[in-house]
């Protein structure tokens, strides 16, 4: 990349910079960079390239401006190339025609925030590219011969300096775009990224492979138009060395003279043969004709050397009486000079220091390009307008800065934010500590206090000893007690006098200052969410660039001062493990990671899992998740940092290991609910993340935790324990009512919705008080299955009623308020974070909050135990039907009879998730009453429920009682295990009812002790079948009276069990009812008429009907019946009962013999439609589970399914087409017919056999281009499709040519 290659493209408007540069500008511009002894402030972006950005930076000490080149690299080869470029520039620096090297620095991937190695290269700042000056000058006429002489001579002097090195340095990328014009008007050569000291001498001994390798390397570092004949044709066996720079100089001289390149199209044949032409009628530049011919010789040995070129130029200059080393003032004069019009910034004298106290930063932003803007005068008003539009966006971020040259912003009239006030050597920069003191003393004499959040300190006497040193660590959120103490201290200072102001600063006045100010705004109840406060800070100063943990701690402050405050508890928390799902891709192969963890509590590191490299487990993407076991107990501010371990050869020899930070998480344990088992963090909740490609989709981090039941009081009393919230009022932030109304109109109504930076979701409409206090109707469950089920659910954080109690007296004493200002409550981990002076409190004001809104906790918790039920709710409309927004305690559930709630408004899901009281029996209103929550019960308990039918059908049929009905109070459990007693119980009688086949059937039920085998708990688990909800396994006669449309009814005597053949079955348990002991699982499936075609209608009670049980994909024990298929009625046909020997055969026919199938329907009749799942009900699971066929089975399918939601269907089709065939021209051509649009008939599919030789590939490629060329599809609906196909084929063809157009065999 060339230095300042596209600097002036910025003038075209704000859209000229790419997205990456725009993001980098917001992240890097404004920062302070230290390079050696220089401290630089990055001011703006000048240009961007493939992997580098160029900024304008200013030395804070001298005010001198530099060009700062920031190069990013993620490969070792690029690292070596960048280091070589720096070495060459450093070696060549000092020549008057080579850009001046100043300093350089680098950091590795592990230390960089971008996940790539970063290199900083500091050089002198030039005025611009020569090519841009030439374009403007040539609009008025051709260049003079003297100007060309100066430009070319100075360029050759720079090349001569390179060739004089030992060994000679070859630039290899000389072109007019790499020539800069300095502020003094001289030529500066730049961009040594392609330079080398290696020459090549090909001969007949070189193999084709070696020639191809050399050609590829040279092609990668040269520009096509400037390539020499020996490079284009390596088989000419000409030496490739310094003479290639002479050829490039000849092209530059030709371009300067005739305003066009001699090989404009880069045609190889013209270059190899040296076919260029000098205009015959040219008389202006005849003095250069021989020089051009001497430099553009095809044979490099015949070309002039750089010494000969310089000597001829000196002779020409002497003949024309021109000093070739003099500045090229003609370019500057014709372009408007250095700044001879308008109020543009004055150009400093050469080598002289810049007076930094002259103009305000606003003036610099108003004219950010200084005198260079003058060259745009005359006919370029549009460019100047775009420049002003671009500058206005920068001005917005500093529009509220104080007058003078200070970087200070007023968030409100009583809260100011500034950058670090410097002294000593840094006294020349903007925020000089003396200037800051004079400004504050003049504007707020004796009524300002300074809060220093940075770890650096200065003399507090500069600000009359009213300085609070907080000492917050960088790149992490502040400790909660320090943040809360700071808010109390600022509040006490503002209350002391209505003229008092708070001045907050960190190093740059961004992240740390934003956390302090936003937390204080929420502390004073101006806002109730972090997002609203951060938005106000961004508008009043600049985007703070804070991390998710910063927002999390601001949310903590919001919780602690809410209408119903949440006080952090003092219970220790056991962190069992850290689980990352899916596995992040941090290995070099991007297929997994080798993680280890460090945990800090406060400033102390309490544990690390780092071991020897080989002893740490490596997780692959196939593992699905990465688990780091911890097992440590923490309390307070917890910082968890996850690293990826890397091993290098040198590290192995020295027993060292390189680590790369993957992410970090910070939170406070006091806000983790007492019954939480998992703390979830999504990808956007993590701090210090690497590039997004390393984190798979839906990546999240789970902390498996357990909060201990007992409190562990800390050594120091937390500051929130003795704080009264009654005096908190947003009026204290403003000087008058008008200011408050203005802020309120801009930022307070309505409060801004939450952004993805915080997990807590914001509800735009505040919920009613009734909805907020609604709790669960179900008692607490202690079932382990319940815990397992709820572990997969995300619930709102449980609010403890204890946190709503105010432990302080209504009035706070003056001593307590004064204590806010001293350092008595500072913990051991923090620096003194309170003002040194004592402050007297002012009168408290009690007004409602500015903007109240419902809030949720910043973290998502998996609650292992559900909350207790709510008290009875009187109005029917307020009942929580689904129990999804409920919170609870440990109080027992009140009976529904006492609550007076109708059955239709009962919590419908509580019984699925909670057991009811064992002593009470639900009436018909208790729709899901049962002993054990069915969705959470184990398979044993599901099969152990009783199935006797007792009582009668309720008068009102509830639409939800298809799930289950409550057990009766007079049902007694069995005294001992009886596996089949319930099946043979003659008391099981079903009442007549209609059960539609489209409804879901109930879960199977049997005796209480079925499969318990005597060693399971004897708690009665009872579910009773009703007439509207028959029991499938409680007795086969239950289904007898179900009236369904279907085939003709089959008369059967009432009360008799029949086998599938129509004969009376022998006494004993039915084989279909005892499937667990029957060796033939298909013995009862011979009658397909009953299992596939539905149930006959009108059967009397007590008759036997074979039914089918459909096992759902969720592996639960629910059963359903198939709807009756319409068609010809099947008359009953007597079949012999199957013999036992046939049932016990290992190879039997599921369908049976022909004589067992009944009468076949005519072949011409309409056949029933059979799907792939229709026969699943014939084959039970037999203890095996089956995955969902409709769901994705691989990670690739999951990604495709996610991509298909918001991607164009044809683009998906195109992605499927190129998958596995990227840039493979043969594979793409052979499958082209699969991706063409409908109606395209010109393309004839070809096979791989038609694409063996390069000629065949070329022929088919041209045919394909004729079919899919976008020009032929203009205006057609498939125009976009043609473009995408054409681009893929074109890229594949280019790759095919680059690889040498090799045959297939």
UniProtKB/Swiss-Prot annotation:
The residues covered by the Phosphatase tensin-type domain are 397-564
What PROSITE patterns is this protein classified in? Answer: C2_TENSIN, DNAJ_2, PPASE_TENSIN, PROTEIN_KINASE_DOM, PROTEIN_KINASE_ST
Q: Which residues carry this modification: Omega-N-methylarginine?
A: 1122
Residue spans of biased composition, Acidic residues class: 822-832
* Subcellular location as annotated: Cytoplasm, Perinuclear region; Golgi apparatus, trans-Golgi network; Cell junction, Focal adhesion; Cytoplasmic vesicle, Clathrin-coated vesicle
Q: Which residue windows are transmembrane per the record?
A: none
This chain belongs to which protein, by name? Cyclin-G-associated kinase
